[in-house]
C-alpha cells in the first residue's frame, strides 16, 4: 500500500472496540472537573517556545507507582532514548474566524469548520437543499464554494439568507444545516479569502482577538502549508523550536508525521452526565504508510513511540483499530475519526504522550486519564496548580508514561 492509497474508514464505523465496556455502564463527567485559578490560564505565549516547563509523569515499573518530576521543556531529549520515534501532527490552522452582517443587518460571527464539496454532503442535506428550489437556486449554488460553519448571531440564520463578511470582501448564503453546523455557500474561493481577511481562531478562553504574534505562535514550526484545514492548533507541538528539534536529531531520536485537522469540537465540554453517552465530534485524519512503517520498525527494535499531543494519539489509535487486526503490522490509513478515548481504553501504539494541561470536563482530560490513570492525572494536575504551571493552549507541557498494568 502506498501513501497515495491509504486504507479508508467508513464514517459509520464504530471505533470503541478497545474499551472494556462490559464492565462500564456509568462514568460521571463530574469526576473530570477541577478548579483552576484564573491567573494560571496562559493567554499569551512565552517569548521562546521551548522555555515552557515540563511535568514528567514517570511510571515506575518496579513498584507500579507514578513519580512526578519538574523539568524544562528543553530537557525533553534527555528523557528519551536513541531509536525512539516522535510523531507530530503537521496540520496548519486556518484564519477561519470572520465577522460581518446578515443581509438584514444583524451582526454575525462565522467560524469555518470544514471546506466541502456538494458531493460531500449526505443525502438528507442535499434533499433539503434541492427541495427548497424556490429559495435556493441550485444552478447558482453549483458554482459556489461550500463550507460547514459555526455561526453566532442574535437570531438564527434562515434558509437562503445572505451574508456579508470581512467588510464586504466575502459574501455568501445559508443553504442548509448539518446537525449543529450551518452549510454556507460563498461566492469566491474560501481559503485565499480567509488568508486575506480571516482571523486566526484562538481559543475562547484567551478572551481576546488574535494579534500578529498569534499568526506565528499559534502555528507549529513544522506545519505543512498544503494542509491548511484546522481551526485549532495541535498545541503540544507549539513547544518545539529548532533548538529542541536539533537536540532530538543529534541524539538519534526519529521523527515522523501524521495529519489530523483539528475541529472546534476540541474545545467542547462533555454535556452529558454519563460520559459514555457523549457523542464525539468527527475530524479528518491520515496516517501515511511511511509513518506506519517507522512505527512498526521502532516497536520491533524495542524502542518507544512518543505521540506529540492528543491529536496524534487519536490518529494512531484509530489506525491501529482499523488496520492492525490479528496482530498484523500497522498500515497507512485515512478517513474521519470519532474515536472517544476514556478510562478503560487499551492503547495499541502509543508508549509515551506529550501533551498540554486540558480543560475541565473535556474529552482530552479523559484521554490522558485513560493513558496514565485518572488518579495519577489528578495528582499531577494538583501538583501543577500548586507549582503554578501555565495551563491550556499556550501553557506548559506534560510528558506521560503509559500506565503500568
UniProtKB/Swiss-Prot annotation:
InterPro entries: QueA, QueA_dom1, QueA_dom2, QueA_sf
Lineage: Bacteria, Pseudomonadati, Pseudomonadota, Gammaproteobacteria, Moraxellales
Reactions this protein catalyses: 7-aminomethyl-7-carbaguanosine(34) in tRNA + S-adenosyl-L-methionine = epoxyqueuosine(34) in tRNA + adenine + L-methionine + 2 H(+)
The keyword S-adenosyl-L-methionine appears for this protein: yes
Similarity annotation: Belongs to the QueA family.
Organism annotation: Psychrobacter cryohalolentis (strain ATCC BAA-1226 / DSM 17306 / VKM B-2378 / K5)
Keywords recorded for this protein, A-Z: Cytoplasm, Queuosine biosynthesis, S-adenosyl-L-methionine, Transferase
EC category: transferase
UniProt name for this protein: S-adenosylmethionine:tRNA ribosyltransferase-isomerase
Gene Ontology molecular function: S-adenosylmethionine:tRNA ribosyltransferase-isomerase activity
Organism domain of life: Bacteria
Pathway noted in the entry: tRNA modification; tRNA-queuosine biosynthesis
One matching Pfam family: Queuosine_synth
Amino acid at each position: 500500500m502506498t501513501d497515495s492509497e491509504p486504507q479508508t474508514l467508513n464514517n459509520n464505523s464504530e471505533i470503541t472496540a478497545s474499551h472494556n465496556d462490559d464492565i462500564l455502564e456509568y462514568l460521571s463527567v463530574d469526576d473530570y472537573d477541577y478548579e483552576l485559578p484564573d491567573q494560571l490560564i496562559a493567554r499569551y505565549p512565552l517569548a521562546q517556545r521551548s522555555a515552557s516547563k515540563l511535568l514528567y509523569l514517570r511510571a515506575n515499573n518496579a513498584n507500579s507507582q507514578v513519580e512526578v518530576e519538574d523539568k524544562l521543556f528543553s530537557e525533553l531529549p534527555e528523557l528519551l532514548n536513541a531509536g525512539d520515534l516522535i510523531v507530530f501532527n503537521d496540520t496548519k490552522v486556518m484564519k477561519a474566524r470572520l465577522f460581518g452582517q446578515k443581509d438584514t443587518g444583524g451582526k454575525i460571527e462565522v467560524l469555518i469548520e470544514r471546506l466541502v464539496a456538494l458531493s460531500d454532503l449526505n443525502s438528507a442535506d442535499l434533499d433539503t437543499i434541492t427541495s427548497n428550489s424556490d429559495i435556493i437556486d441550485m444552478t447558482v449554488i453549483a458554482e459556489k464554494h461550500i463550507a460547514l460553519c459555526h455561526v453566532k448571531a442574535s437570531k438564527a440564520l434562515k434558509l437562503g439568507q445572505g451574508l456579508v463578511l470581512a467588510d464586504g470582501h466575502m459574501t455568501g448564503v445559508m443553504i442548509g444545516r448539518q446537525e449543529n453546523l450551518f452549510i454556507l455557500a460563498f461566492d469566491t474561493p474560501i481559503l485565499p479569502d480567509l488568508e486575506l481577511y480571516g482571523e486566526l481562531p484562538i481559543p475562547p478562553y484567551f478572551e481576546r482577538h488574535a494579534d500578529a504574534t498569534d499568526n506565528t505562535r499559534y502555528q507549529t514550526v513544522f506545519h505543512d502549508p498544503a494542509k491548511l484545514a484546522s481551526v485549532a492548533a495541535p498545541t503540544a507541538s507549539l513547544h518545539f523550536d529548532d533548538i529542541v528539534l536539533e537536540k532530538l536529531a543529534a541524539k538519534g531520536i526519529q521523527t515522523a508525521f501524521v495529519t489530523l485537522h483539528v475541529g472546534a469540537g476540541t474545545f467542547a465540554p462533555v454535556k452529558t452526565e454519563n460520559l459514555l453517552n457523549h457523542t464525539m465530534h468527527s475530524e479528518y485524519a491520515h496516517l501515511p504508510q511511511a509513518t506506519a512503517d517507522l512505527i512498526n520498525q521502532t516497536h520491533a527494535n524495542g524502542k518507544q513511540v512518543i505521540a506529540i499531543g492528543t491529536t496524534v494519539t487519536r490518529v494512531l489509535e484509530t489506525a491501529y483499530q482499523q488496520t492492525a487486526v490479528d496482530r498484523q503490522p500497522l498500515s497507512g490509513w485515512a478517513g474521519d475519526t470519532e474515536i472517544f478515548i476514556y478510562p478503560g481504553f487499551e492503547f495499541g501504539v502509543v508508549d509515551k504522550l506529550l501533551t498540554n494541561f486540558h480543560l475541565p470536563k473535556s474529552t482530552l482530560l479523559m484521554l490522558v486519564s485513560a493513558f496514565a490513570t485518572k488518579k495519577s492525572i489528578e495528582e499531577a494536575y494538583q501538583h501543577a496548580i500548586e507549582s503554578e504551571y501555565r495551563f491550556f493552549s499556550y501553557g506548559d507541557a506534560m510528558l506521560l508514561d503509559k500506565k503500568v498494568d
